[in-house]
Amino acid sequence: MTWGRSGRVAHSDWRRLASEEDRREYDAFGPWIYEIKAEGDTPKRFRAACASHHDARFLLKAPRNVERRDVRPGMDLYVAVLAVHDDGLSLMRLTDERVVSQDVVWSEVAALESYKDLLYSRWTLMLRDGGAFVFEYNTVSAGLMGKATDFVRSRWIRHDEAPSARQANSVVTVADRYFSNALAAQRRHGPQPVEPIHFEPAGRYCRDAANRFAISTGVMFLDAPDELIIVNRDKPTRRFFEAVDAVSCIFVPYAGLTSFALARPPTCRAPRFHQLRLSVDKQVVEQSCLVEPAGVLARLAAYGVPQTA
Protein backbone atom coordinates (compact mmCIF):
# COMPACT_ATOMS: atom_id res chain seq x y z
CA MET A 1 0.00 0.00 0.00
CA THR A 2 1.53 3.33 -1.03
CA TRP A 3 -1.24 5.81 -0.30
CA GLY A 4 0.57 7.49 2.58
CA ARG A 5 3.91 7.54 0.73
CA SER A 6 2.54 9.36 -2.30
CA GLY A 7 0.87 11.90 -0.02
CA ARG A 8 4.15 12.60 1.81
CA VAL A 9 6.07 13.04 -1.42
CA ALA A 10 3.48 15.50 -2.73
CA HIS A 11 3.60 17.39 0.56
CA SER A 12 7.38 17.80 0.42
CA ASP A 13 7.53 18.68 -3.28
CA TRP A 14 5.86 22.09 -2.99
CA ARG A 15 8.66 23.39 -0.79
CA ARG A 16 11.50 21.76 -2.73
CA LEU A 17 10.18 23.08 -6.04
CA ALA A 18 9.66 26.66 -4.80
CA SER A 19 12.24 29.36 -5.52
CA GLU A 20 14.46 30.60 -2.71
CA GLU A 21 12.68 33.98 -2.81
CA ASP A 22 9.24 32.36 -2.48
CA ARG A 23 10.43 30.14 0.37
CA ARG A 24 11.85 33.15 2.21
CA GLU A 25 8.57 35.05 1.87
CA TYR A 26 6.61 31.98 2.95
CA ASP A 27 8.81 31.37 6.01
CA ALA A 28 8.31 34.97 7.18
CA PHE A 29 4.55 34.98 6.53
CA GLY A 30 2.24 35.57 9.49
CA PRO A 31 -0.65 37.78 10.63
CA TRP A 32 1.55 40.81 11.17
CA ILE A 33 2.28 43.81 8.96
CA TYR A 34 5.84 43.99 7.62
CA GLU A 35 7.74 47.17 6.88
CA ILE A 36 9.27 46.98 3.39
CA LYS A 37 12.91 48.07 3.63
CA ALA A 38 14.34 46.64 0.40
CA GLU A 39 13.05 45.70 -3.04
CA GLY A 40 13.31 42.03 -2.13
CA ASP A 41 10.77 42.60 0.67
CA THR A 42 8.15 43.80 -1.83
CA PRO A 43 5.59 41.17 -2.88
CA LYS A 44 6.03 40.32 -6.58
CA ARG A 45 2.54 41.51 -7.53
CA PHE A 46 3.24 44.95 -6.05
CA ARG A 47 6.73 45.64 -7.39
CA ALA A 48 5.66 47.75 -10.35
CA ALA A 49 3.19 49.75 -8.23
CA CYS A 50 5.75 50.26 -5.44
CA ALA A 51 8.55 51.42 -7.75
CA SER A 52 7.82 55.09 -6.99
CA HIS A 53 7.32 54.61 -3.25
CA HIS A 54 10.68 53.42 -1.94
CA ASP A 55 11.32 56.88 -0.42
CA ALA A 56 8.13 56.64 1.69
CA ARG A 57 8.27 57.31 5.43
CA PHE A 58 6.34 54.06 5.90
CA LEU A 59 6.01 51.30 3.31
CA LEU A 60 3.91 48.53 4.84
CA LYS A 61 2.61 45.25 3.43
CA ALA A 62 -0.52 43.65 4.88
CA PRO A 63 -1.01 39.85 4.71
CA ARG A 64 -4.05 37.96 3.57
CA ASN A 65 -6.45 36.93 6.32
CA VAL A 66 -5.80 33.24 5.85
CA GLU A 67 -4.53 30.33 7.94
CA ARG A 68 -0.85 29.60 7.43
CA ARG A 69 -1.59 25.91 6.84
CA ASP A 70 -3.60 26.91 3.75
CA VAL A 71 -0.80 28.79 1.96
CA ARG A 72 2.24 27.65 -0.02
CA PRO A 73 5.37 29.36 -1.39
CA GLY A 74 4.61 31.29 -4.57
CA MET A 75 1.03 32.18 -3.62
CA ASP A 76 -0.07 35.81 -3.30
CA LEU A 77 0.43 36.12 0.46
CA TYR A 78 -0.07 39.90 0.72
CA VAL A 79 -3.24 41.74 -0.18
CA ALA A 80 -2.26 45.40 0.28
CA VAL A 81 0.67 47.80 0.53
CA LEU A 82 0.41 51.17 2.29
CA ALA A 83 2.88 53.93 1.38
CA VAL A 84 2.93 56.98 3.69
CA HIS A 85 4.78 60.06 2.38
CA ASP A 86 5.34 63.59 3.67
CA ASP A 87 2.60 64.97 1.41
CA GLY A 88 0.07 62.11 1.41
CA LEU A 89 -0.27 58.37 1.06
CA SER A 90 -1.13 55.60 -1.37
CA LEU A 91 -2.97 52.35 -0.74
CA MET A 92 -2.31 49.58 -3.24
CA ARG A 93 -4.68 46.60 -3.16
CA LEU A 94 -4.58 43.28 -4.98
CA THR A 95 -8.00 42.72 -6.59
CA ASP A 96 -8.91 40.30 -9.38
CA GLU A 97 -5.27 39.52 -10.17
CA ARG A 98 -4.28 43.18 -10.54
CA VAL A 99 -3.12 45.96 -8.25
CA VAL A 100 -5.39 49.00 -7.82
CA SER A 101 -4.00 52.18 -6.22
CA GLN A 102 -5.77 54.94 -4.31
CA ASP A 103 -3.89 58.17 -3.58
CA VAL A 104 -4.72 60.80 -0.96
CA VAL A 105 -3.04 64.11 -0.09
CA TRP A 106 -3.29 65.44 3.46
CA SER A 107 -5.49 68.39 2.47
CA GLU A 108 -8.20 65.87 1.50
CA VAL A 109 -8.26 64.27 4.97
CA ALA A 110 -10.99 65.29 7.43
CA ALA A 111 -10.17 62.93 10.31
CA LEU A 112 -8.41 59.69 11.18
CA GLU A 113 -9.86 56.76 13.13
CA SER A 114 -7.86 53.96 14.75
CA TYR A 115 -10.19 51.09 15.69
CA LYS A 116 -9.43 47.85 17.54
CA ASP A 117 -11.65 44.93 18.55
CA LEU A 118 -9.59 42.04 19.91
CA LEU A 119 -7.45 40.81 16.98
CA TYR A 120 -9.24 42.89 14.33
CA SER A 121 -8.03 46.44 13.69
CA ARG A 122 -9.01 49.08 11.17
CA TRP A 123 -7.28 52.32 10.19
CA THR A 124 -9.58 54.81 8.48
CA LEU A 125 -8.87 58.14 6.87
CA MET A 126 -12.17 60.02 6.65
CA LEU A 127 -12.07 62.25 3.58
CA ARG A 128 -13.53 65.72 3.15
CA ASP A 129 -15.67 64.58 0.22
CA GLY A 130 -17.53 62.13 2.49
CA GLY A 131 -15.56 59.06 1.42
CA ALA A 132 -13.15 56.94 3.42
CA PHE A 133 -9.78 55.28 2.97
CA VAL A 134 -9.71 52.00 4.95
CA PHE A 135 -6.75 49.76 5.83
CA GLU A 136 -7.52 46.58 7.82
CA TYR A 137 -4.94 44.61 9.76
CA ASN A 138 -4.33 42.26 12.70
CA THR A 139 -3.97 43.94 16.10
CA VAL A 140 -0.56 42.29 16.60
CA SER A 141 0.73 45.12 14.38
CA ALA A 142 -0.83 47.90 16.47
CA GLY A 143 2.57 49.28 17.50
CA LEU A 144 3.74 49.83 13.93
CA MET A 145 0.39 51.31 12.87
CA GLY A 146 0.51 53.57 15.92
CA LYS A 147 3.74 55.08 14.58
CA ALA A 148 2.06 55.65 11.22
CA THR A 149 -0.89 57.27 13.01
CA ASP A 150 1.36 59.68 14.90
CA PHE A 151 3.16 60.61 11.68
CA VAL A 152 -0.12 61.39 9.91
CA ARG A 153 -1.25 63.49 12.87
CA SER A 154 2.02 65.43 12.74
CA ARG A 155 1.15 66.47 9.17
CA TRP A 156 -1.68 68.72 10.36
CA ILE A 157 0.27 70.56 13.08
CA ARG A 158 -0.05 74.25 12.21
CA HIS A 159 2.83 75.72 14.28
CA ASP A 160 0.84 78.85 15.11
CA GLU A 161 -0.57 79.93 18.46
CA ALA A 162 -3.52 77.92 19.76
CA PRO A 163 -6.48 79.61 21.51
CA SER A 164 -5.95 80.62 25.13
CA ALA A 165 -5.59 77.83 27.67
CA ARG A 166 -8.51 76.47 29.62
CA GLN A 167 -9.35 77.94 33.01
CA ALA A 168 -8.22 76.05 36.13
CA ASN A 169 -11.81 75.24 37.10
CA SER A 170 -12.30 73.43 33.79
CA VAL A 171 -9.85 70.63 34.63
CA VAL A 172 -11.48 67.24 33.96
CA THR A 173 -10.62 64.19 36.07
CA VAL A 174 -10.68 60.82 34.32
CA ALA A 175 -11.77 58.34 37.00
CA ASP A 176 -11.90 55.14 34.99
CA ARG A 177 -9.12 52.58 34.53
CA TYR A 178 -9.68 52.00 30.84
CA PHE A 179 -9.95 55.67 29.87
CA SER A 180 -7.08 56.59 32.21
CA ASN A 181 -4.87 54.13 30.36
CA ALA A 182 -6.02 55.56 27.02
CA LEU A 183 -5.17 59.08 28.24
CA ALA A 184 -1.74 57.94 29.41
CA ALA A 185 -1.10 56.30 26.03
CA GLN A 186 -1.97 59.50 24.16
CA ARG A 187 0.29 61.54 26.41
CA ARG A 188 3.11 59.05 25.98
CA HIS A 189 3.02 58.55 22.21
CA GLY A 190 1.21 61.48 20.60
CA PRO A 191 3.02 64.26 18.70
CA GLN A 192 1.48 66.98 20.94
CA PRO A 193 0.41 67.37 24.60
CA VAL A 194 -3.23 66.52 25.34
CA GLU A 195 -5.69 67.35 28.13
CA PRO A 196 -9.16 65.87 28.82
CA ILE A 197 -11.99 68.36 28.30
CA HIS A 198 -14.99 66.02 28.67
CA PHE A 199 -15.30 62.59 30.25
CA GLU A 200 -18.18 60.21 30.88
CA PRO A 201 -17.45 56.96 32.73
CA ALA A 202 -18.90 53.68 31.57
CA GLY A 203 -21.69 51.90 33.42
CA ARG A 204 -24.46 54.51 33.61
CA TYR A 205 -28.07 53.43 33.16
CA CYS A 206 -29.61 55.12 30.14
CA ARG A 207 -31.79 54.62 27.08
CA ASP A 208 -30.35 53.71 23.71
CA ALA A 209 -31.34 55.04 20.28
CA ALA A 210 -34.36 52.69 20.24
CA ASN A 211 -35.45 54.02 23.68
CA ARG A 212 -34.58 50.72 25.39
CA PHE A 213 -32.88 50.55 28.77
CA ALA A 214 -29.12 50.02 28.40
CA ILE A 215 -25.77 50.74 30.00
CA SER A 216 -23.44 53.43 28.68
CA THR A 217 -19.92 52.53 27.52
CA GLY A 218 -18.36 55.93 28.21
CA VAL A 219 -16.52 58.53 26.15
CA MET A 220 -13.56 60.87 26.55
CA PHE A 221 -12.65 64.00 24.58
CA LEU A 222 -9.04 65.17 24.57
CA ASP A 223 -7.83 68.59 23.48
CA ALA A 224 -4.47 69.02 21.72
CA PRO A 225 -3.16 72.28 20.24
CA ASP A 226 -4.23 71.27 16.72
CA GLU A 227 -6.75 68.46 17.09
CA LEU A 228 -9.74 67.13 18.98
CA ILE A 229 -9.41 63.48 20.00
CA ILE A 230 -12.46 61.31 20.73
CA VAL A 231 -11.95 58.03 22.59
CA ASN A 232 -14.98 55.72 22.72
CA ARG A 233 -15.93 52.04 22.78
CA ASP A 234 -17.35 52.05 19.21
CA LYS A 235 -21.01 52.13 20.30
CA PRO A 236 -22.44 54.29 23.10
CA THR A 237 -24.40 51.55 24.90
CA ARG A 238 -24.31 47.86 25.66
CA ARG A 239 -26.83 45.32 26.91
CA PHE A 240 -26.74 44.47 30.61
CA PHE A 241 -24.59 41.32 30.26
CA GLU A 242 -22.77 42.21 27.04
CA ALA A 243 -18.98 42.47 26.93
CA VAL A 244 -17.52 45.31 24.88
CA ASP A 245 -13.93 44.91 23.69
CA ALA A 246 -13.81 47.50 20.91
CA VAL A 247 -12.07 50.85 21.20
CA SER A 248 -12.01 53.73 18.75
CA CYS A 249 -9.76 56.80 18.73
CA ILE A 250 -10.81 59.53 16.31
CA PHE A 251 -8.43 62.41 15.57
CA VAL A 252 -10.06 65.53 14.10
CA PRO A 253 -7.84 68.52 13.18
CA TYR A 254 -9.44 71.77 14.33
CA ALA A 255 -8.26 73.64 11.24
CA GLY A 256 -10.42 71.55 8.93
CA LEU A 257 -13.71 71.81 10.83
CA THR A 258 -16.39 73.73 8.96
CA SER A 259 -19.17 73.55 11.59
CA PHE A 260 -20.54 71.69 14.59
CA ALA A 261 -24.00 71.02 15.99
CA LEU A 262 -25.45 69.52 19.17
CA ALA A 263 -28.83 67.79 19.13
CA ARG A 264 -30.26 67.60 22.65
CA PRO A 265 -32.42 64.64 23.73
CA PRO A 266 -35.99 64.83 25.03
CA THR A 267 -36.34 64.94 28.80
CA CYS A 268 -37.18 61.57 30.33
CA ARG A 269 -36.64 59.63 33.55
CA ALA A 270 -33.65 57.65 32.23
CA PRO A 271 -30.98 59.76 30.51
CA ARG A 272 -30.77 59.76 26.72
CA PHE A 273 -27.93 60.88 24.52
CA HIS A 274 -26.97 64.23 23.08
CA GLN A 275 -25.61 63.93 19.53
CA LEU A 276 -22.54 65.99 18.71
CA ARG A 277 -21.95 66.41 14.97
CA LEU A 278 -18.60 67.62 13.69
CA SER A 279 -18.63 68.57 10.00
CA VAL A 280 -15.63 68.83 7.69
CA ASP A 281 -17.15 69.74 4.32
CA LYS A 282 -19.17 66.61 3.37
CA GLN A 283 -17.65 64.40 6.07
CA VAL A 284 -19.48 64.13 9.42
CA VAL A 285 -18.14 62.70 12.68
CA GLU A 286 -20.88 61.93 15.21
CA GLN A 287 -20.49 61.19 18.91
CA SER A 288 -23.16 60.37 21.50
CA CYS A 289 -22.84 62.03 24.94
CA LEU A 290 -25.05 61.45 27.97
CA VAL A 291 -24.09 64.86 29.35
CA GLU A 292 -23.80 68.05 27.34
CA PRO A 293 -20.08 68.28 26.42
CA ALA A 294 -19.70 71.89 27.53
CA GLY A 295 -15.90 71.78 27.50
CA VAL A 296 -15.88 70.53 23.92
CA LEU A 297 -18.34 73.18 22.77
CA ALA A 298 -16.22 75.88 24.40
CA ARG A 299 -13.05 74.72 22.66
CA LEU A 300 -14.76 74.53 19.28
CA ALA A 301 -16.03 78.07 19.77
CA ALA A 302 -12.54 79.22 20.83
CA TYR A 303 -11.17 77.91 17.54
CA GLY A 304 -13.82 79.87 15.66
CA VAL A 305 -15.76 76.84 14.42
CA PRO A 306 -19.33 77.98 13.64
CA GLN A 307 -22.21 76.24 15.41
CA THR A 308 -25.27 75.30 13.39
CA ALA A 309 -28.74 74.31 14.51
Please provide the spans of the model-predicted regions.
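Intrinsic disorder/low-complexity detector
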Residues: 1-79, 86, 117-226, 231-309
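Short N-terminal edge-element motif at the start of the domain
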Residues: 61-69, 85-107
